[in-house]
From Swiss-Prot:
Protein name: Histidinol-phosphate aminotransferase
InterPro entries assigned: Aminotrans_II_pyridoxalP_BS, Aminotransferase_I/II_large, HisP_aminotrans, PyrdxlP-dep_Trfase, PyrdxlP-dep_Trfase_major, PyrdxlP-dep_Trfase_small
NCBIfam families, sorted: hisC
Residues found modified as N6-(pyridoxal phosphate)lysine: K211
EC numbers for this chain: 2.6.1.9
Any Pfam family matching the protein: Aminotran_1_2
GO biological process, one term: L-histidine biosynthetic process
Any one Gene Ontology molecular-function term assigned to this protein's record: pyridoxal phosphate binding
Necessary cofactors: pyridoxal 5'-phosphate
PANTHER family found in the cross-reference section: HISTIDINOL-PHOSPHATE AMINOTRANSFERASE, HISTIDINOL-PHOSPHATE AMINOTRANSFERASE-RELATED
Pathway(s) annotated for this protein in UniProt: Amino-acid biosynthesis; L-histidine biosynthesis; L-histidine from 5-phospho-alpha-D-ribose 1-diphosphate: step 7/9
Organism whose genome encodes this protein: Buchnera aphidicola subsp. Baizongia pistaciae (strain Bp)
Stretches that traverse the bilayer: none
Length: 360
């Protein structure tokens, strides 16, 4: 039997997301997935697993609501932000009729989730400054139900101007939802727009424990919006989305003690990023290092294929961005421990000596 005859046409044509782990590599230093370099110290309490979990764990909802300073009715717990991205399309978009919009170069799952669900996606490239092209957005917004933007943006590391997000919210009121993915916001927490949920009924914010909380392996995220949107999404989400072990560890991570630990680690990592970038700025093999407020930064090399190959062969795994919109010769580097950063510097210095000799 030819199984392709049974598969939906749009799935046959789909180019799947390449996760950091699926790409492979025999790495000792993993700087390709924007994970926090230090593991969490949480451990499971004694829980029974013979009963199904709550649909939405009350303790976890209350803990996250307290952390953000909003009411729990405005929160939906999801299996990472990826489930929330897909859930919004399932709930609000009619296949082959409605559209979503996103702004490349950015996180690929906005586009891929739409394609899986047979919903048209419109990619409006960011400007050279990696900011929104509002004029082009407004000219192409007809039929768009969901607009996804990542802030700070992945892979560029910059913040989208708050006034531009507000302009989008105002222009699309009553027509579309603006979905702001704040996966990396703890690294620049003062720039969150969560509090705008009270003012704008078409705002949805996505958050996660995968990055600053050092819980990428847990798969726990949060969708924040007004209670009417939460109620609609609750009709569509799976009946038991959050397992008891996930709920337990996620709730523990939101205790005052563990939030203090997270904030302290974020402060240290931000200092490491500044130091790391400073070490790289004078290298001949580098064209540009783009400013970042997240736990990663984007580097444009003169020859990114050579750099990627050298790092790979030395078991340092980074993320090639050459196929992304307007990112030729670019590599995204996650900020690791100081020792991991030193290893990157050591390899790049060796490459740099070749460039110095050529320039002479």
């Amino acid at each position: 039997m030819d199984i392709k005859k049974l598969v939906r046409k749009n799935i046959l044509q789909l180019v799947p997301y390449q996760s950091a782990r699926s790409i492979g590599g025999n790495g000792d230093v993993w700087l390709n997935a924007n994970e926090f370099p230090i593991s969490s110290c949480l451990s499971l309490i004694n829980i029974s697993l013979n009963r199904y979990p709550e649909f939405q764990p009350k303790k976890l909802l209350n803990a996250y609501a307290f952390y953000l300073g909003i009411c729990s009715e405005k929160i939906l717990v999801t299996r990472g932000s990826d489930e929330a991205i897909e859930l919004l399309i399932k709930t609000f978009c009619e296949p082959r009729k409605d559209k979503i919009m996103y702004f490349p170069p950015t996180y690929d799952m906005y586009d891929i989730s739409a394609k899986i669900l047979n919903v048209e996606s419109i990619g409006i490239p960011l400007l050279k400054s990696f900011q929104l092209d509002l004029n082009l957005i407004f000219r192409n917004i007809c039929g768009v139900k969901l607009i996804y933007l990542c802030n700070p943006n992945n892979p560029t590391g910059n913040l989208i101007k708050k006034q531009d997000i507000i302009a989008l919210l105002t222009y699309t009121k009553g027509k579309a939802l603006i979905v702001v993915d704040e996966a990396y916001i703890e690294f620049c927490a003062m720039h969150s727009i969560v509090q705008l949920i009270e003012k704008y009924s078409n705002l949805v914010v996505l958050r996660t424990l995968s990055k600053a909380f050092s819980l990428a392996g847990l798969r726990c995220g949060f969708l924040l919006s007004n209670s009417n949107i939460i109620k609609m999404l609750s009709k569509v989400i799976n009946p038991y989305p959050i397992s008891l072990p996930v709920s337990d560890l996620a709730t523990q991570s939101l205790s005052k003690k563990n939030i203090d630990i997270m904030n302290s680690r974020v402060l240290d990592l931000n200092k490491t990023r500044v130091w790391f970038v400073k070490q790289l700025r004078t290298m001949y093999c580098i064209n540009t290092i783009f400013d970042s407020v997240a736990n990663y930064f984007l580097v444009k090399f003169h020859d990114s294929k050579l750099v990627f190959k050298e790092l790979w062969e030395n078991k340092v795994i980074v993320r090639d961005q050459n196929k992304k919109t307007n990112l030729k010769n670019c590599i995204r580097i996650s900020v690791g421990t100081r020792l991991e950063c030193f290893e990157v510097i050591r390899i790049l210095e060796r490459i740099d000596r070749l460039y110095k000799n050529v320039r002479r």
